[in-house]
């Protein structure tokens, strides 16, 4: 008999759980915008894809940064120049009492720069990416990414994850 394997308590059971967490972050972001009298963001498939690339890059490299693993700026993940980015590395121990979406939104809302991105009326669309990884200290964590694009902006391509140089 093989021993039973049990997932980590903080790990989502499947992709549907991760998708639900991403949607919860989008919903919470739009609730914050509504509280501030700002129009809701629409979800962009291309921004969702790009945000996931950014989260995956950080999870693969273990480096939490607005600079991509190959040294390029975060906005090179798409062909749009009008992208804003919020990132957070959320260690598993921080998720003991509250959900990932609630915890990361609290952290972003407590930071003036992150809050400014979430409440910027110039932005019209959002994408969210989440990836499980380890941080620079070897701690299990989630890399959380929000990407924002100006109203009327467009993306024709999304880059592949960049490798460390």
For the regions a protein language model found, what residue spans apply to each?
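Second-shell loop/turn segments in exported
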Residues: 8-20, 34-44, 85-98, 102-105
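Short, well-ordered surface patches within globular domains
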Residues: 13-75, 121-127, 131
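Short, charged low-complexity linker/loop segments at the C-terminal edge of domains
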Residues: 151-160
């Amino acid at each position: 008999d093989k021993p039973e394997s049990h997932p980590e308590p903080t790990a989502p059971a499947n992709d549907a759980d991760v998708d639900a967490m991403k949607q919860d972050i989008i919903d919470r972001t739009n609730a914050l915008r509504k509280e501030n009298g700002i129009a809701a963001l629409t979800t962009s498939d291309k921004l969702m894809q790009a945000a996931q690339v950014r989260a995956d890059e950080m999870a693969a490299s273990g480096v939490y940064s607005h600079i991509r693993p190959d040294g390029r700026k975060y906005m090179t993940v798409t062909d749009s120049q009008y992208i804003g980015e919020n990132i957070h590395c959320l260690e598993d121990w921080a998720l003991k009492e509250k959900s990932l979406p609630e915890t990361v939104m609290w952290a972003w809302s407590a930071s003036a720069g992150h809050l400014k991105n979430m409440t910027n009326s110039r932005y019209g669309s959002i994408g969210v990416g989440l990836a499980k990884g380890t941080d620079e200290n070897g701690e299990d964590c989630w890399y959380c990414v929000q990407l924002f694009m100006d109203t009327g902006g467009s993306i024709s391509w999304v880059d592949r994850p960049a490798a460390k140089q």
